[in-house]
């Protein structure tokens, strides 16, 4: 199995996470190409983009709710993977960590490392302007210097966030409703902070589902899933 240093990158963003070395379940060249699956992002003069603008303004209204804004800003974190995964702690019913839940942690980290590269090609190809850039707005999260000039379509946070929900719901199916609800809100946080258009987010959920489907055909993924399920049952 090929080992990777843990990097999620579409320049200029590079994030290193812990000493854990992910092992991908499927090689990148075997993954479906999102350029041939997802539609192109809406043109700025299209009815679909008008809907994106409506949702952008919805997001700005949501910022007026200090509690929801705090959630959206916290959801923007990607520098510490354990912090990220524990955005699902309440929905999942327990904390997730490399030390305390190593099998669950490994399942998630390896799944993300496998599927996340799918977004790189369409991001570079479309290089879609982000909402905060188009409207010369200021983002409420810390990401603005890193995101400026980097394509918005599809959304990496949303792809990973929806994938995390899909995987955790396999581990703990009795908590699926809460897990999916958390993932849905996590993805929408990207609209609220002005990092992404709604169409970025919606198509990223589809992209995550495509990647999740690929994982189901991996013997290594299925074997690790069983370990994670047993660990979950022993700790709940």
Predicted regions and their residues:
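Positively charged n-region of N-terminal signal peptides that target proteins for export
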Residues: 1-3
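N-terminal signal peptide c-region/cleavage motif recognized by signal peptidases
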Residues: 12-16
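Short alpha-helical patches at coil-to-helix transitions and adjacent helical residues
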Residues: 157-162, 201-208
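Short acidic/histidine-rich active-site segments
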Residues: 196-199
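C-terminal subdomain of the subtilisin-like protease fold in secreted/lumenal serine endopeptidases
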Residues: 203-205, 210-211, 216-236
């Amino acid at each position: 199995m090929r080992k990777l240093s843990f990097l999620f990158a579409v320049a200029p963003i590079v994030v290193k996470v812990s000493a854990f070395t992910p092992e991908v379940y499927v090689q990148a060249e075997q993954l479906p190409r999102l350029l041939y699956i997802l539609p192109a992002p809406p043109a700025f003069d299209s009815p679909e983009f008008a809907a994106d603008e409506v949702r952008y303004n919805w997001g700005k209204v949501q910022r007026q709710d200090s509690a929801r804004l705090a959630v959206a800003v916290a959801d923007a974190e990607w520098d510490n993977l354990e912090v990220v995964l524990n955005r699902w702690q309440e929905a999942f019913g327990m904390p997730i960590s490399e030390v305390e839940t190593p099998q669950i942690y490994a399942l998630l980290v390896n799944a993300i490392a496998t599927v996340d590269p799918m977004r790189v090609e369409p991001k570079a190809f479309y290089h879609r302007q982000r909402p905060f850039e188009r409207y010369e707005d200021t983002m409420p999260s810390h990401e603005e210097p890193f995101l400026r000039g980097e394509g918005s379509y599809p959304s990496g946070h949303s792809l990973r966030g929806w994938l995390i929900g899909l995987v955790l719901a396999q581990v703990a199916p009795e908590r699926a409703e809460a897990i999916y609800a958390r993932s849905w809100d996590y993805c929408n946080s990207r609209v609220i902070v002005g990092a992404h258009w709604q169409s970025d987010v919606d198509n990223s959920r589809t992209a995550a589902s495509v990647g999740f489907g690929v994982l189901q055909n991996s013997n290594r993924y299925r074997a690790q899933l069983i370990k994670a399920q047993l660990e979950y049952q022993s700790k709940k």
